[in-house]
Amino acid sequence: MTVLAPAWSPTTYLLLLLLLSSGLSGTQDCSFQHSPISSDFAVKIRELSDYLLQDYPVTVASNLQDEELCGGLWRLVLAQRWMERLKTVAGSKMQGLLERVNTEIHFVTKCAFQPPPSCLRFVQTNISRLLQETSEQLVALKPWITRQNFSRCLELQCQPDSSTLPPPWSPRPLEATAPTAPQPPLLLLLLLPVGLLLLAAAWCLHWQRTRRRTPRPGEQVPPVPSPQDLLLVEH
């Protein structure tokens, strides 16, 4: 008896490949119908923080974009990667505490986040700060986790580089700027009152001389002596 295999068309193979690829990679629709954040996440984080050495070195991103919707989710993505890394070097007791915290932020793996960009810079800090920031992000995200769609947050973004930022102060446009009058020298300001006083004194002296030479109404002007009169006076 011969059993015939079903005939598979190229379209069928293509559909199967699409289904497999979508199942292997995270969904592009980053939204949550039910809150993945438990009500006692702060207790789990505090228990881990109390057990860990407070000065255990980790790294946090220093130039993540301050995006209102995506910023908190991006920091949880990086924190979740640290939880996975710490579990590989922790003892059995520590692994249990790390796994409890990791469970609280593991929901970020349900979204197909892109690898961190090369522009992202990291600075060293201690584990207590990382856990504190994780708790703060969960507190801020919990009321909105089921109300927002985070599909546009799948690519972590860096802050603009300092070389591309505008200067901290820039002058107004020329058409909106009134021309500035040149500042007079200080010496000119000091000499100006003296010059005005001298000018006033000269004017008063000139006025007094003019007044003496001008006869008043009814006043007789003495005749100007002739040369003969001057000779008689001399003899």
From Swiss-Prot:
It comes from the Eukaryota. InterPro entries: 4_helix_cytokine-like_core (IPR009079), Flt3_lig (IPR004213). One of its GO terms (biological process) is signal transduction. GO terms for cellular component: cell surface; cytosol; extracellular region; extracellular space; membrane; plasma membrane. The keyword Disulfide bond applies. Residues 27-184 are extracellular. The keyword Disulfide bond applies. Glycans are attached at N126, N149. Homodimer (isoform 2). PANTHER family: FMS-RELATED TYROSINE KINASE 3 LIGAND, SL CYTOKINE. It is linked to Immunodeficiency 125: An autosomal recessive immunologic disorder characterized by failure to thrive and chronic diarrhea in infancy, and recurrent bacterial, viral, and fungal infections. Patients have severe human papilloma virus (HPV) infections with disseminated common warts, and the bone marrow is hypoplastic with low levels of CD34+ hematopoietic stem cells. Counts of B cells, monocytes, and dendritic cells are low in patients blood. This is Fms-related tyrosine kinase 3 ligand. It comes from Homo sapiens. The lineage of its organism: Eukaryota, Metazoa, Chordata, Craniata, Vertebrata.
